Amino acid sequence: DRLAHELMEPGKTVYQGIVDAFGMEVLMDTDIDISAPAEGNAVTDNGQSTVNRSIDRKKLGDIVFHDKDKLALLNSISHPLVKEEILRRIEEQKDAGKKLFVIEAALLIQDGYKSICDKMCYVYADLDVRISRLCEYRGFTKERAQAVIDSQESEAFYLEACDYKIDNSGSLENTKKDLKHILDECRI
């Protein structure tokens, strides 16, 4: 998520695609006059300046997590560019002598990462824990948290596709212990 959010910032690769696809209504509200483009700012197809307004992820989420076609559109804009950047960063780190790379993302399997990953691990939590955490840490309502979860593949899909599973319903210490066990097993 961090990399995707980084690439959604004004001037980054994903930003203009999202503005073109979803319009100015997905941008943060501002008191700035946006009637005339300022030098260096992106401009939409209808000639409006984005005035370097950040994408409002809540507004965008309200659109895509209630419409599978719009979610697919967002994913088609962002995911190829995120994957390209991940691969670039991996190569950069390989050149620096690094040997372990961890990619944390919701759609690794769907976006074809299995072909570049030696092992895949599914970290999951009970439904009530997931909803509670989304509400607490991201400020979601229960309805929005459920909509996000409903937009994802089934738990069985991930359990079947991954080499390792970690139950993250409990404490962070237990999750770290399970992860260490996996890393030890992989001799990392």
Q: Over which residues does each language-model region extend?
A:
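Short beta->alpha linker loops
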Residues: 55, 77-78, 125, 149-153, ...
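Anionic group-transfer/hydrolysis microenvironments
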Residues: 1-3, 106, 112, 169
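An amphipathic alpha-helix signature
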Residues: 15-19, 83, 127-135, 142, ...
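ATP-dependent small-molecule kinase phosphotransfer cores
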Residues: 5-98
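Small-molecule kinase domains that catalyze NTP-dependent phosphoryl transfer to phosphate-bearing small molecules
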Residues: 85-86, 94, 115, 136, ...
